[in-house]
Amino acid sequence: AESACRIDRLRGEVLALLGRFDEAEEAFSQAKPPAEAAGLDDVIADILSNLADISLKRGDSDSSLNMHRKALELFISIGDAIGAARSYNNMGYILRRSGDKNKALEAYSEVENILAGDDSLDLIPAQIVLARALLDLGESDRARDHALSSYERSESGEDAILHARARAVLGRYYAKTGDADLALHHYTDALSTMGEAGDPLALVEVSILLGEVLQDSGRIEEALERYREALVISEANDLRMQIGELLARLGGVAPDRQRRMEYLQRALSVFRELGAQTRMREVQMMVHTAVMGR
């Protein structure tokens, strides 16, 4: 029963990555009772964390926040610093999205406390997420410290993808602070590493970031080209959430109104199919703006 529930959990994680939320939820629901019966707190915490992510994508942030809190309690009780840091990061994201900046910063401060007391390289992914979040919250100095730290600490490691992710967040810092050339340098290097490593999801994520910098620098044609390339990769790998995201980006920057509308309508149908309510509402606003001709 123990190995069966671990397999169901893994199946759920893969299905969630593919944007097949109903099937993922079913797999997690199958895994949960045997995990509870066997007292496997690590598995239960992971399941709660994954279910919370699905709830958020469906637009139910309250339920997502509650599940992340429950997962956090379990991670703390079993002394899992990586799980706890991930939970705090996720909670910070939800609080930030709902406009509660102070509470979000409190959650991110908890991640900083974990990092201060544990220099494990396994915490670098959480530090990268933290750096991005602090940048978005306007905490540039704190963000720079974590971006540089994760960049330096991952430099000598075996994990080329992790180092590329750290480079991407450093690129984001330079983009936010107005140094587009340095930003592009880090993003381009990160992309080539991810291309060589054959990680389509990471490749798409960094392509989106690179597109953002090009867009902000007024290089619209190049940004469109990046988004289109990333869309092809997403479609080839059935990354449905990313397909929707890229269609929405293309709908935001395409030069003529008809193309914008086409991209946005396609993005809407992808998000509707996925049940991603929050993104659907945001794209509907973009459609409204495009219709009004702004």
Question: Where do the protein language model's features map onto the residues?
Answer:
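Flexible inter-repeat linkers and adjacent short helices
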Residues: 1-28, 32-40, 268, 276-294
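Conserved alpha-helical positions within TPR/SEL1-like repeat arrays
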Residues: 6-17, 42-57, 68, 82-97, ...
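Residue-level detector of the short coil/turn that links helix A to helix B
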Residues: 19, 59, 79, 99, ...
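Amphipathic alpha-helical segments of tetratricopeptide repeats
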Residues: 29-40, 70-80, 109-119, 148-159, ...
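Eukaryotic tandem repeat interaction scaffolds
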Residues: 122-239, 243
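C-terminal non-catalytic interaction modules
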Residues: 225, 229-232, 236-294
